[in-house]
Amino acid sequence: MERISQVIISAICGIITADFGSGFVHWAADTWGSIELPIIGKNFLRPFREHHIDPTSITRHDWIETNGDNFMITLPILGKLTWIFFSYSKTEIQAEYPFCAYLFLCSIFVAVTNQIHKWSHTYFGLPIWVQVMQNYHIILPRKHHRIHHVAPHET
């Protein structure tokens, strides 16, 4: 309990890192490289670029198609955290806990970044709790994100 402030700060930093990282990756995929590049172009860059042709296409994807790739990216980190919690002593876990909180929240928010993005393109039928979080800018609001898809800001 004495390190709760460290854990809270670490958790918030994990969320901010995920938010910044996802924005940076989106910007980089929109800006650099060619969709003709082997593997990366077809599997990574093309979906980002096609999203700007049909921004609402993401709303027609199921949960796995929307979030699966991002969840897969986080598995090594979540696996490492699981290993720490099952193999470290209580003292070692307590020493590592703020960093573990950072990694966990960063991983979870990386995993759901496409879901949050999908909600920013969904105009009907969102749960009230999602709308509240959008209205208070806790997650990406629809009106704010729309600017990204309209010239001259389109990237």
Question: Residue ranges of each PLM-predicted region?
Answer:
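Membrane-interface helix-boundary signature
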Residues: E2-I8, E96-F99
